[in-house]
Amino acid sequence: MHTTQKDTTYTKIFVGGLPYHTTDSSLRKYFEVFGDIEEAVVITDRQTGKSRGYGFVTMADRAAAERACKDPNPIIDGRKANVNLAYLGAKPRIMQPGFAFGVQQIHPALIQRPFGIPAHYVYPHAFVQPGVVIPHVQQAAAASTSPYIDYTSAAYAQYSAAAAAAAAYDQYPYAASPATTGYVTTAGYGYAVPQPLTAAAPGTAAAAAAAFGQYQPQQLQADRMQ
């Protein structure tokens, strides 16, 4: 003879977060105010007989179960518990307002990186000056022992005079010039290296422009025809 099992999908309640001193009778006593109870049991450890901190309560009807689950975090035996229908599973506790926030995960590659810039593009503070934008550094041009190009004040000094002369003759793509530091000469023609990040002093630029004042556009045109 087969027995018909009652459907408890909407009447069986899971109760979690119970204190260890909660018993079947104390659990039943709490839920009696919501309606008739068919069963109330606290799950215990088989070896020690102590409560595992959760239990199940089966209400007589669905309406009673809904009333019992209206408060998802009731205080049972002095401790905040969590209540939900058993078929839905355990419901997480509601955290206090002061702690109801999550910590954003930080990518390991951005840890200990100033401004979140990858390591290859992080420049030492000695190279970053107010108003100066350092261009993109190619990896092939970087030093073998460091990802940064050694731009020092001494390295800038040798290009200051060349930068002033190049600025004075920007309109001539190929200008004849004597052997000057910072210029590369080949086949009688010279071209200026790219201007450095720091501009030359006004006095230096004026002196360089005066030194090349003797070259007239006609002479430069003749030099290009050679």
UniProtKB/Swiss-Prot annotation:
Protein name from the UniProt record: RNA-binding protein 24
GO MF annotations, alphabetized: mRNA 3'-UTR AU-rich region binding; mRNA 3'-UTR binding; mRNA CDS binding; pre-mRNA intronic binding; sequence-specific mRNA binding
InterPro entries tied to this protein: Nucleotide-bd_a/b_plait_sf (IPR012677), RBD_domain_sf (IPR035979), RNA-binding_reg (IPR050886), RRM_dom (IPR000504)
Membrane-spanning ranges: none
Functional description taken from the UniProt entry: Multifunctional RNA-binding protein involved in the regulation of pre-mRNA splicing, mRNA stability and mRNA translation important for cell fate decision and differentiation. Plays a major role in pre-mRNA alternative splicing regulation. Mediates preferentially muscle-specific exon inclusion in numerous mRNAs important for striated cardiac and skeletal muscle cell differentiation. Binds to intronic splicing enhancer (ISE) composed of stretches of GU-rich motifs localized in flanking intron of exon that will be included by alternative splicing.
Biological process annotations from GO: 3'-UTR-mediated mRNA destabilization; cell differentiation; DNA damage response; mRNA destabilization; mRNA processing; mRNA stabilization; negative regulation of cytoplasmic translation; positive regulation of 3'-UTR-mediated mRNA stabilization
Subcellular localization: Nucleus; Cytoplasm
Signal peptide start-end: none
Domain notes: The RRM domain is necessary for mRNA stability and mRNA translation regulation.
Alphabetical keyword list: Cytoplasm, Differentiation, mRNA processing, mRNA splicing, Nucleus, RNA-binding, Translation regulation
Domain RRM, chain residue ranges per copy: 11-88
GO cellular component, one term: nucleus
Main location: nucleus
UniProt keyword Ligase, yes or no: no
CDD domains recorded: RRM_RBM24_RBM38_like
